[in-house]
Amino acid sequence: DFARSPGHLVGKLDVEAVEFPIKGAVQVNIITVDEDYRGRGIAKALYGIVLTIMRRPLVAGSSQTPGGRRNWASLSQIPGVEMKGYVRLDEEDLETDPYDSDPRWAKKAEQNIDVIMGQLGGQYIGSQPGDYYFAFDVQPTTTGKELQAYVDSNLSKLYKNSTHSHVGLYAVWTGQ
């Protein structure tokens, strides 16, 4: 709750450490702004503190309100901040078992990498145990659901077996 007194709290951003291949990344857990102060850029300023002052990569939370999506989109307007989409794929979709004699698995893994990097324009950004991450350029208005639909649609056109993917958005300080 927000108190109604001088110096009262008008906004709060709660972030938590997240398993992400970019060192120091934090994920938005919750952001809230007092109703009387909404529309004044407070949420964007809170995100900006994490990115420009703390210089921590910021990963979007798993769910967003319409207002949260607008705030997230506004991050690309902060000078020196770059916003990207990412897809996380299970290693089983990109690796083959060296002891597996079936060459179809190796071919499928190579095709998945070709689609992600070639046809979808993904850039490999790293891995966490069991997962590989690829970044994508996105428009500032792109939502996680739109990115998921785009990735799923392109992968499903080529493969009958669905890959195990998760998509999201992240922002980093580039200082440029």
List each language-model region with its residue ranges.
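Conserved acetyl-CoA binding element of GNAT-fold acetyltransferases
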Residues: 23-35
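Conserved acetyl-CoA-binding loop-helix of GNAT-fold acetyltransferases
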Residues: 33-52
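Terminal substrate-recognition subdomain of acyl/acetyltransferases
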Residues: 5-22, 52-176
